[in-house]
A protein has these predicted regions:
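Post-HExxH zinc-binding segment in Zn-dependent metallohydrolases
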Residues: 2-24, 28, 170-213, 286-291
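Soluble non-cytosolic domains of exported or imported proteins
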Residues: 81-85, 180, 247, 251
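Active-site recognition of the HExxH zinc-binding catalytic motif
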Residues: 145-164, 183-187
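N-terminal low-structure segments adjacent to metalloprotease catalytic domains
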Residues: 1-67, 74, 78-80
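Auxiliary, metal-adjacent structural segments of Zn-dependent hydrolase domains
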Residues: 68-127, 139-143
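Pan-zinc metallopeptidase signature
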Residues: 211, 217-294
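Short pre-active-site segment immediately N-terminal to the catalytic Zn-binding motif
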Residues: 134-150, 177
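Hydrophobic, aromatic-lined core segments that form the binding pocket/scaffold
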Residues: 130-133, 158
Length: 294
């Protein structure tokens, strides 16, 4: 079994924010980079590159995020404290249930909105980047929500490790069908690790029942966007929604994985070739979109 490691940048963020909290958002943005994030060059580079690839100016994004830092500071602090309390036990559960044999670095930081959880590599090792600003925004600072989030991201890392793909895997997720498969796989792993269906990303108690009732419609809408080469980001991520419901793509992907589990092991599902993922994913969506649910 590998080991969990922690890189906690919260003390550095707190020192930066003590100096920057009363300044203009433009100054806060500059100081975030120079006083805080430049101490972690790879972490900085990953965030900036994410927005560059989408043709966005990270400073403009930061201007929308930084004004909430003061009001969300207590939730960010609680999230950081809870992560420290639980990350080792969640890693142990994941190692036992998924038979993991690699180290994971958990990076706790305050960034520019690149996600509450981000499964990737850091210093050439498997890593989970935990963005406190997004965690606080989603109100995922409780231990229950964080256990789900961390388990979900470990699921992504297990998937990458079994496929022996890291950067290539993140690039493959740009295809909407592969993203559906990837997020569904991670969501299934979350439930396996925690021993029950936790759905940490459900925004309220009605979310799951709505998704089940609208499963056919969700599949049809996802297919329509693929066919018209439209973005599917409304199905994923905390800033987007479908008919007012966020994160519905995770449910749709989870159902895809559950269907595949009827004839395959989890590892066999993890190792499906990209072309086969797309073929099976489209078959699943087409079949589902022609069904009606009460």
């Amino acid at each position: 079994m590998g080991k969990p490691k922690l890189l906690d940048t919260w003390p550095e963020f707190s020192r930066y924010w003590n100096q920057a909290c009363s300044k203009s958002v433009e100054e806060q943005t500059t100081l975030w980079r120079t006083l805080y994030m430049e101490k972690y060059p790879e972490l900085l580079s990953k965030q900036l590159q994410t927005y560059e690839e989408d043709g966005l100016d990270w400073k403009e994004i930061a201007k929308k995020i930084f004004p909430s830092f003061s009001s969300r500071f207590p939730q960010m602090q609680k999230a950081r404290d809870n992560i420290i309390r639980i990350y080792k036990s969640i890693y142990s559960k994941a190692a036992e249930t998924l038979k993991l044999h690699f180290n994971i670095t958990f990076v706790v930081y305050v960034g520019i909105g690149c996600g509450a959880g981000w499964a990737t590599t850091y210093k050439e090792q498997p890593a989970i980047l935990l963005g406190l600003e997004n965690i606080a925004e989603e109100k995922w600072h409780t231990q229950q929500k964080l256990k789900g989030l961390i388990s979900h991201e470990i699921g992504h890392l297990a998937h990458m490790a079994w496929r022996e793909e890291w950067q290539m895997f993140e690039q493959a997720e740009k295809d909407p069908v592969f993203q559906l498969y990837s997020e569904g796989f991670a969501q299934r792993c979350e439930h396996i690790i925690l021993g029950k269906e936790t759905w940490h990303l459900a925004e309220n108690k009605k979310w799951l029942s709505w998704c089940k009732q609208h499963k056919s419609w969700l599949a049809k809408e996802f297919l329509r966007r693929i066919e018209k080469q439209m973005m599917v980001k409304d199905f994923f991520g905390s800033w987007f929604n479908i008919q007012g419901r966020k994160q519905t793509g995770y449910f749709l992907g989870h159902e895809f994985i559950r269907m595949l589990e009827e004839t395959r092991s989890l590892r066999e599902i993890a190792l499906l070739k990209v072309d086969n993922v797309r073929k099976l994913g489209l078959q699943y969506l087409n079949a589902l979109s022609n069904k009606t649910f009460e």
